[in-house]
């Protein structure tokens, strides 16, 4: 079955289960859920299509229904967990379907059943959904969820403790409302004590979760100041870096990076980290994680390195670790123990920056951003020589990023490509800030690449149609690419052949007006600066359309004002120019015709004003005011009509789509009904045939039963005979085995006896030597007593020092007590071992007795065998005598029988 039919079957099964929650309906729904899980439809559910949305809504309703069976609930949670593995689907489930509150209610319902798998799966799914997501504590079931999590964390440790800690860390991170709610509870001090006790846990993931919750709740309070004080912060850093390098997996590494990034936002802790003596070795271990790790771990490590770059002194150390000390022997060795093998960090960064567009993580963007930071620091510090060899490695990767794709990309991949190109251009712009690096960059850049790239961005961003959406993220990234490309061209126009002519040609292109006006009216500071630099270059040119730029800026400002006044409405701002292409829509053509008529009226009025005398200026100005009011009214009417037309067109397209979907669904349902009717007829015909076969087989089975009973009685008799034979064989084999075992045990015991006698002799020798040593020690003790008398005098002088050391002695006494307890435990174990040794000696004695008895039995059996052999010999001799006598008798009787033919057995 295809995905569409499977989802329809799922919707039908859910509807049937809602109407009647019977076992049969539950079984059908369970099978449909397993089918959907097996198909792996994550991308289909991530789309905004109607059928997957209905399926998700029905699944959420199943979780909300308290009468849903636990088996169906668990299977539904498994399906949603597999779908939530995709980040876009997870965000949709949280934001659109309110799954977080539904799962919180589910946890509240199952909170009394601790060992239920539904509770564990729900908490794990909540942990995945709430990662890097802010949840309002005033939402439904969230306060109950927080109370449950705190109770479970403070309860004895079980399998729920770790996911509860992770979920609590997600809820408290960057969420002031949840933090305030937790701090307002009465049992928060006990909760803090429990979290602090978890810092000594053997599982590194539990330690990270507990430390993350403590950092979120207590970082700016008295408890946090004690916990992250300068006396303890170095141990905390060592613990965090240890977990980061030697963590249990990607999940632990994610939370460790988030924790360290949150701590770096505190200026005191950032200052402590700059003074941390082992930061260099820890940084090399962290850079080593970029080599040979998965994309998830690499992206989190890159985020951490970018967070280090936010601190000036740490950025300098990071630059030295990446460039200056790369490849040095021992660069990756630190105090962290068995870390990962570290290749040159810059080579690993080049590898991650060349990641493909289809990769799920944004490692390429982060790696390029990190290159930008370290290159900028190298240029500022005047140490570009260390970075030169890595520039040659990076430039081919950047050129590959700037290439135009061969095929058309979808919107998500196109936006991702634009972001990556923008980051690559940032790196090139930074490299052009130093002459040597700038020369290396200009050696590989050509004009055609920039011209084709700017043309491609003009075409794919919709600038050719002179219409843009101000709130479109793709348009913003395309604008950034165009502006940064022109900024880079302006920096290298004197060093690359034909670059200057191409640069000024693009500046005079009317398509540049839309992105330039957007940049000048943007809220982003860097975008405004880039737009101003380009404007200063373009303004003196004769072909630059400055009037159109002014109109575009005014239109953007009007749109921004309208958006601030009416934020829910989002319309497109249209900029018309004389060089624009004519649109194809009839509605837009009418609007363009009316706008041209207005332009003609304005021109006529202007020419009329030039012909008229100055005496009629007042009247003409009044007429102009009237016309301006009419023009503004017409413009507002046109915008409203355009909005209505767009809304109606959208509604009509949605209605057509719904009608088409309904017709398709109806046709598919009718086809399925026909198939089911045909299947039902076939099954009825098969049932009749099978009933006839069943009757004939019943008759044959009755005959077979009688034959089987006769054979069974005969087999019983044979089985009894076989059982007796087998018993005799088994008893004979058992006796042989026992005899062989006894012989082996006797030999082993004899060998052990010999060893024990040797050990006894050695113990006697040791005893004699110990006596001699004892006499020597007595003599030494006498000497020590004399020394002791001398030392007592010295001890009287040191009584003052002893009073200061008494506190330390108390601690040592406690340790001694623990050692004494351990000693007592060891003595108990020694007593137990002695008892076991005595038992083994008794067993040895019993075995020796058994061995002696077996030897006696053996001698008796040998004597009996000798007697029986003697008797057999005597009988044989008597038989021989009898045979001779019979032969003599036959010979005397006439020799009719030969002696050879005599039957001796008689």
UniProtKB/Swiss-Prot annotation:
A motif (Nuclear export signal) lies at residues 599-613. GO terms for cellular component: chromosome; cytoplasm. The keyword Nucleus does not apply. Belongs to the CIP2A family. It comes from the Eukaryota. Acts as an inhibitor of protein phosphatase PP2A. Together with topbp1, plays an essential role in the response to genome instability generated by the presence of acentric chromosome fragments derived from shattered chromosomes within micronuclei. The CIP2A-TOPBP1 complex tethers chromosome fragments during mitosis to ensure clustered segregation of the fragments to a single daughter cell nucleus, facilitating re-ligation with limited chromosome scattering and loss. It holds the Pfam family CIP2A_N. It is found in: Cytoplasm; Chromosome. Residues 626-884 form a coiled coil. Its main location: cytoplasm. Homodimer. Interacts with topbp1; forming the CIP2A-TOPBP1 complex. The keyword Ion transport does not apply. GO terms for biological process: chromosome organization; DNA damage response. Keywords: Chromosome, Coiled coil, Cytoplasm, DNA damage. GO terms for molecular function: protein phosphatase inhibitor activity. This is Protein CIP2A homolog L.
């Amino acid at each position: 079955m295809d995905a569409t039919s499977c989802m329809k079957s799922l919707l039908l099964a859910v509807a049937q289960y809602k109407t009647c929650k019977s076992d049969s309906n539950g079984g059908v729904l369970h099978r449909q859920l397993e089918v959907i899980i097996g198909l792996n439809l994550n991308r289909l559910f991530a789309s905004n299509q109607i059928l997957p949305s209905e399926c998700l809504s029905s699944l959420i309703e199943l979780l909300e229904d308290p009468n849903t069976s636990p088996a169906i609930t668990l299977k539904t949670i498994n399906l949603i967990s597999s779908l939530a593995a995709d980040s876009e689907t997870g965000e949709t489930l949280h934001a659109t379907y309110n799954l977080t509150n539904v799962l919180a209610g589910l946890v509240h319902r199952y909170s009394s059943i601790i060992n239920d798998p539904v509770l564990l799966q729900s908490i794990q799914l909540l942990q995945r959904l709430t990662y890097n997501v802010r949840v309002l504590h005033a939402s439904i079931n969230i306060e109950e969820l927080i109370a449950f999590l705190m109770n479970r964390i403070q309860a004895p440790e079980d399998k729920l403790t770790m996911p509860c800690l992770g979920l609590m860390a997600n809820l408290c991170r960057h969420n002031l409302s949840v933090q305030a709610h937790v701090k307002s509870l009465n049992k928060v001090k006990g909760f803090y004590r429990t979290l602090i006790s978890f810092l000594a846990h053997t599982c590194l993931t539990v330690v990270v979760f507990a430390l993350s919750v403590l950092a979120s709740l207590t970082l700016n309070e008295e408890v946090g100041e004690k916990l992250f004080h300068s006396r303890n912060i170095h141990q905390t850093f060592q613990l965090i870096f240890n977990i980061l390098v030697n963590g249990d997996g990607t999940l632990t590494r994610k939370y460790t990076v988030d924790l360290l990034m949150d701590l770096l936002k505190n200026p005191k802790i950032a200052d402590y980290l700059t003074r941390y003596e082992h930061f260099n070795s820890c940084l090399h271990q962290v850079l080593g994680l970029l080599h040979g790790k998965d994309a998830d771990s690499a992206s989190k490590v890159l985020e951490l390195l970018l967070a280090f770059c936010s601190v000036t002194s740490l950025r300098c150390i990071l630059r030295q670790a990446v460039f200056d000390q790369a490849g040095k022997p021992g660069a990756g060795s630190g105090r962290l123990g068995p870390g990962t093998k570290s290749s040159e960090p810059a080579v690993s960064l080049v590898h991650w920056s060349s990641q493909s567009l289809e990769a799920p993580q944004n490692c390429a963007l982060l790696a390029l951003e990190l290159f930008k930071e370290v290159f900028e620091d190298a240029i500022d510090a005047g140490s570009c020589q260390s970075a030169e060899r890595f520039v040659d490695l990076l430039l081919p990767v950047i050129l590959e990023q700037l290439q135009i794709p061969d095929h058309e990309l979808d919107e998500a991949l196109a936006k991702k490509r634009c972001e990556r190109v923008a980051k690559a251009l940032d790196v090139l712009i930074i490299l052009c800030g130093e002459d040597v690096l700038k020369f290396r960059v200009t050696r590989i850049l050509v004009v055609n690449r920039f011209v084709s790239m700017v043309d491609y961005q003009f075409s794919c961003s919709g600038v050719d149609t002179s219409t843009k959406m101000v709130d479109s993220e793709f348009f913003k990234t395309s604008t950034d690419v165009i502006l940064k490309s022109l900024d880079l061209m302006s920096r290298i126009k004197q060093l690359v052949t034909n670059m200057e002519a191409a640069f000024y040609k693009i500046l005079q292109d009317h398509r540049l007006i839309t992105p330039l006006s957007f940049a000048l009216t943007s809220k982003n500071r860097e975008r405004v600066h880039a737009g101003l630099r380009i404007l200063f270059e373009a303004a003196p040119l004769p072909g630059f359309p400055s009037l159109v730029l002014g109109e575009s800026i005014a239109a953007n400002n009007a749109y921004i004002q309208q958006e601030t006044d009416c934020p829910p409405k989002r319309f497109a701002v249209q900029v018309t120019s004389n060089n624009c292409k004519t649109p194809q829509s009839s509605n837009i053509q009418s609007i363009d015709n009316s706008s041209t008529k207005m332009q003609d009226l304005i021109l006529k009025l202007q020419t009329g004003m030039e012909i008229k005398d100055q005496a009629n200026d007042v009247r003409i100005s009044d007429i102009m005011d009237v016309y301006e009011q009419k023009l503004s009214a017409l413009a507002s009417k046109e915008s409203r009509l355009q909005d209505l037309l767009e809304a109606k067109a959208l509604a009509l397209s949605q209605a057509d789509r719904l009608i088409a979907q309904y017709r398709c669904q109806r046709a598919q349902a009718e086809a399925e009904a026909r198939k089911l009717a045909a299947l039902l007829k076939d099954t009825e015909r098969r049932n009749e045939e099978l009933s006839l076969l069943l009757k004939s087989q019943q008759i044959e089975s009755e005959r077979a039963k009688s034959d089987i009973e006769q054979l069974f009685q005969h087999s019983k008799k044979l089985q009894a005979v076989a059982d007796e034979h087998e018993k005799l064989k088994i008893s004979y084999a058992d006796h042989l085995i026992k005899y062989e075992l006894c012989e082996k045990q006797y030999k082993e015991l004899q060998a052990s006896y010999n060893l024990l006698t040797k050990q006894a002799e050695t113990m006697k020798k040791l005893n004699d030597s110990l006596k001699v040593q004892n006499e020597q020690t007595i003599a030494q003790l006498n000497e020590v007593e004399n020394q002791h008398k001398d030392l007592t005098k010295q001890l009287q002088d040191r009584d003052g020092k002893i009073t200061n050391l008494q506190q330390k002695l108390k601690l040592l006494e406690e340790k001694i007590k623990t050692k004494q307890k351990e000693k007592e435990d060891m003595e108990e174990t020694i007593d137990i071992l002695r008892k076991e040794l005595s038992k083994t000696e008794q067993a040895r004695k019993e075995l020796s007795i058994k061995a002696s008895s077996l030897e006696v039995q053996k001698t008796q059996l040998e004597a009996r065998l000798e007697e029986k052999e003697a008797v057999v010999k005597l009988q044989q001799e008597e038989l021989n005598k009898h045979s001779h006598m019979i032969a003599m008798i036959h010979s005397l009787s006439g020799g009719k029988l030969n002696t050879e033919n005599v039957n001796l057995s008689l």
